[in-house]
């Protein structure tokens, strides 16, 4: 299942709620609507600075968001159909302080509309400076949810079966392209063997011995040990490991009612020249007194990795306890 170039958030040509057609546009693409009378080069520069951060932990810088801008008067149906919209409003009669709000499906089904409201241009500048990262994170999380639903009905039954056999107690829905599989002791590996951008999935477990079992050092130490044993490279003696020269980024997230420790970092092949980004979720599997780790890695030397990582990461959000 390739990442679509033009994605309809509720199905192409379908409608959702009150006859709305599905929102369109590329993942992580957004339009910013600038208020009438305030559309200036300075405001546009402020928007670019606030929303121009790179995606976290990639080997090269890639902008997290693709940002388009339009004036309020030119906010046509083409823009109204897009999946992510930031609508800036300045009105001293209606607002006394800056605020951020969201609404959904206003112009199209599956659409996220973020409102930035303030009483003055100066307040908008401050709001963008303070909340730019929060706005970007909101859009990124929305894209993960959207893409994860692409696997509600169509997913790899082979990986689901191996997850049950090798891990037990959990199910995950991953891309049907992940058809090359390998198993070990409480370990599962699936790959699409892609030529222009490759994605691999890992799942493994280790004993839960207290809160320290979910700390970064422990997760990475186990990861390195498991991958050294199970993921050999093309050259004799080579194996996958963590690139320790680049710090990992840790966050605590929740999906399907399950708290998760999220770790982002770079991987490298010891004894070879391969490398790329990874993201994993580590979970306290209380019923089985163990930690479950599910992970996606991407390999695309010299190529853009943002969309590959987004699609790969979205599949981790399909993990849930087996019935």
Question: What positions do the PLM features span?
Answer:
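Long, acidic/polar, low-complexity amphipathic helices and coiled-coil-like
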Residues: 102-165
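Start-of-domain marker
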Residues: 13-110
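Extracytoplasmic beta-rich ectodomain segments of secreted or membrane-anchored proteins
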Residues: 159-175, 179-183
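C-terminal motif of bacterial Sec signal peptides marking the signal peptidase cleavage site
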Residues: 5-8
